[in-house]
A protein has these predicted regions:
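Hydrophobic transmembrane alpha-helices
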Residues: 192-196, 237-245
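Hydrophobic alpha-helical transmembrane segments
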Residues: 94-109, 184-192
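Aromatic-anchored segments of alpha-helical transmembrane domains
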Residues: 37, 41, 130-138, 210-220
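Interfacial helix-loop-helix junctions of multi-pass membrane proteins
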Residues: 144-149, 175-179, 214-240
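Alpha-helical transmembrane segments of integral membrane proteins
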Residues: 19, 23, 27, 31, ...
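Membrane-interface loops
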Residues: 50-61, 112-204, 251-265
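N-terminal transmembrane-helix/juxtamembrane module of multi-pass inner/ER membrane proteins
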Residues: 2-102
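Short, intrinsically disordered terminal tails adjacent to the first/last structured region
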Residues: 1-13, 253-266
Length: 266
């Protein structure tokens, strides 16, 4: 009896620490590392030894022209709001980098370990949206507003923190011409919705609902995206959601039934 009790306790502890087992955790990490590798390869193919730069700048000029045409080139106004407070500047600059690494990573790990039944849909939604975004980067490389100081746009991060997409340790993960669509905007919406749904406390749900609009403000006010980039990111998110849901429903319908466990008592 003591051996069986100890075994059951060990099993419950293992399930709590690794709800899907060590093999699945290694698989999930490998999956994301593989995506980063594909991202880097696709970026290298699209760059063509630097030839993408003039194309990206021209595409950005088209974005500026469109926003001007509809009288909605308001990113500079957001920058003025940001510059009204040094605290706001520091928060926005930190948010821009932490959102795609620390916050996104935390959300994935939290759902994986604490709400594991929701993880697959969350992961697939993120990955599909990022794959669509990656195709967008390759087909429509677009420069961010900060690369047009002649038009009055500021590179807030370079001015106040010195950290830019070309900084050491950052350049390996940042594509300076990946403004369209904004994956910051897309990922923030996915994370915000997913975390708001799985969190139980009201204050946590409210904070996660506020996460997407804060990110949208941040990426525009720091000069990293136009609002049209953010809109494209939101549309990518909305396009990916029904595909993921359809795949999830198909998987649930075709999932093999779990064998029932019969307990025989003496």
């Amino acid at each position: 009896m003591p051996d069986s009790t100890a075994s059951a306790t060990t099993r419950r502890t293992s399930e709590r620490l690794l709800p899907r087992g060590l093999g699945d955790l290694v698989f999930q990490i490998s999956l994301w590392l593989g995506f980063v590798l594909v991202y880097r390869l696709a970026w290298g193919i699209a760059d063509h030894g630097g030839a993408v730069t003039p194309v990206a700048r021209e595409n950005a000029r088209h974005v500026i022209a469109f926003e001007n045409h509809v009288n909605a080139l308001f990113e500079q106004s957001l920058q003025k709001v940001l510059l009204s407070s040094r605290l706001l500047v520091d928060l926005a600059a930190a948010t821009y980098w932490l959102s795609q690494f620390v916050v996104l990573g935390f959300a994935l790990l939290w759902v994986y370990f604490r709400q594991t039944e929701s993880f697959t849909r969350f992961r697939n939604w993120l990955m599909l949206a990022n794959v669509i975004g990656l195709v967008g980067f390759v087909l429509i490389p677009t420069a961010p507003p900060r690369m047009f100081p002649n038009l009055g746009f500021l590179d807030i991060e370079a001015l106040f923190s010195g950290l830019t997409a070309s900084s050491k340790g950052v350049g390996a993960f940042a594509n300076p011409y990946a403004a369209m669509p904004s994956l910051h905007a897309a990922d923030a919406l996915i994370v915000g919705i997913s975390m708001a749904l799985v969190c139980r406390r009201l204050w946590a749900k409210v904070l996660w609902c506020l996460w997407p609009p804060w990110i949208w403000f941040t990426v525009m006010a720091t000069g990293n995206h136009f609002w049209l980039d953010c809109l494209a990111g939101v549309l990518v998110t909305l396009a990916a959601a029904p595909i993921v849901d359809a795949r999830f429903r198909f998987w649930r319908r075709n999932k093999p039934a779990q064998p029932k466990t019969v307990v025989v008592r003496d």
